[in-house]
From Swiss-Prot:
Residues 1-23 are annotated as: Disordered. A zinc finger (NR C4-type) spans 30-50, 66-90. GO terms for biological process: regulation of DNA-templated transcription. This is Nuclear hormone receptor family member nhr-61. Belongs to the nuclear hormone receptor family. Gene3D superfamilies: Erythroid Transcription Factor GATA-1, subunit A, Retinoid X Receptor. One of its GO terms (cellular component) is nucleus. Orphan nuclear receptor. The gene is nhr-61. Residues 144-407 form the NR LBD domain. Residues 1-19 have a biased composition (Low complexity).
């Protein structure tokens, strides 16, 4: 794990220096909320409350949503009013999430304590254990990271022989069978997210199916998940596909620059209602009942477009989105495996960012903060698909019923 050094106070050998435990008055201010600061934590002067809040937010991979457009004031008196704006403020002033990953002392769940005006040197020294790795082990780890990135590239580039592209497999298939036999869902056609034409309803369905096959291929490539029991693996697949799908389409849309949701087959779903695809017939019905296309542009595509992600950030970020949130009702062993995989791919995402280490952490955290927008889109998309199903606008197949039933439910 890459760890930033956190400065600590050391006693001077000079006779004029204060002895350990001697009270001294500090005039430092917390860069986040303006309260009294203990010293530097994660790269900036921070009070105990903001230090603990930032630490837990990163450790527990928390995502927050602001109900006021991200414009809340973060000050000592109301710093707990909006956690989303508080975390954004932490990142803006330069707090480094990568330093948190190496911190071995976890704060208690509460983060607000009375702050005395005078503090002793002994209370300001944080214990930090850093695992030292030899140059050889670091080199070996870098090789492994490059291999994983190359493997992900190969998955995105993988295609079936062209003679299989038109084959269909009519029949009734449950989710588990489709997961292990993806040919009944879709062939691996080339991914062409170029947004050259407005999508038809057939394009929408074909993209959903092709994205699911890509999702399964990626999920099966994650080494840490190979020992997960079968039932838990199905829960992971059902609960995380929707978030993965939105990340996939949104990163494609940001790169293609289209005014809508970019698909894998050269088409895109326009944000303009008048241009949206409809079902056949005189009174054709559209599938976007919630304005989800426009919301995806505003809340997800535009921030991604400004970030100008590299190909490595896009493909590793997709895995990070799959692993980002806890999966409900899996075994304790699976929870631990998911947490370990999450930490590994968070580090791998930082490895893909060719910036100074402090800026790496800020960029990674900015991507993680987008998860709140992704989950809002998952809500809206679920409503769209369920209503479309009732109106018989689209038919995704029997295999997808379990996926649609569970794509946002917290219980299985």
């Amino acid at each position: 794990m890459i760890v930033d050094s956190i400065s600590s106070s050391t006693a001077s050998t000079s006779s004029s220096s204060p002895t350990r435990g001697t009270p001294i008055r500090k005039s430092l201010q917390c860069a986040v909320c303006g309260d009294v600061a203990l010293g530097k934590h994660y790269g900036v002067n921070a009070c105990n409350g903001c230090k603990g809040f930032f630490r837990r937010s990163i450790w527990k991979n928390r995502t927050y949503a602001c109900r006021h457009g991200g414009k809340c004031l973060v000050a000592k008196e109301q710093r707990n009013a909006c956690r989303s704006c508080r975390l954004t403020r932490c990142l803006d002033v330069g707090m480094n999430p990568r330093a948190v990953q190496g911190d071995t002392v976890e704060d208690p769940e509460w983060d607000e304590e009375a702050m005395p005006e005078t503090l002793s040197i002994s209370t300001q020294t944080d214990a930090l254990k850093v695992k030292k790795k030899s140059h050889t082990s670091l080199f070996t780890l870098d090789i492994k990271k490059e291999q994983i990135i190359d493997n992900l590239r190969a998955i995105y580039a993988r295609t079936d022989p062209e003679e299989f592209w038109k084959l269909t497999y009519p029949g009734t298939y449950d989710f588990r069978y489709a997961f292990h036999n993806t040919k009944v869902v879709s062939p691996r056609t080339p991914l062409t997210p170029t947004a050259e034409r407005i999508a038809t309803l057939n394009d929408v369905v074909a993209d959903f199916r092709r994205a699911f096959v890509l999702f399964v291929d990626i999920l099966k490539s994650i080494d840490q998940l190979r020992d997960v029991q079968e039932d838990d693996k199905m829960k992971i697949a059902k609960s995380r596909f929707a978030a993965f799908y939105w990340w996939l389409c949104s990163t494609w849309s940001a790169k293609a620059g289209c005014n809508g949701v970019c698909y894998s087959n050269g088409s895109y779903h326009p944000a303009s209602i008048s241009d949206m695809p409809k079902s056949e017939g005189k009174h054709g019905v559209r599938i976007d009942y919630s304005g989800v296309s426009q919301k995806s542009l505003e809340n997800l595509v535009e921030p991604l477009r400004r970030m100008e992600l590299s190909d490595e950030e896009r493909i590793v970020g997709a895995v990070m989105v799959i692993l980002a949130d806890p999966v409900p009702n899996v075994s304790t062993k699976t929870e631990k495996i998911l947490a370990e995989a999450r930490d590994f791919y968070l580090e791998l995402l930082g490895y893909c960012i060719k910036l100074p280490e402090e800026q790496q952490g800020i960029r990674v955290s900015t991507m993680v903060l987008l998860l709140a927008s992704i989950m809002e889109l998952v809500h809206l998309t679920t409503d769209n698909i369920q209503l479309s199903d009732v109106l018989h606008v689209i038919d995704l197949g029997d295999w997808s019923q379990e996926l649609r039933d569970h794509r946002y439910r917290r219980q299985f």
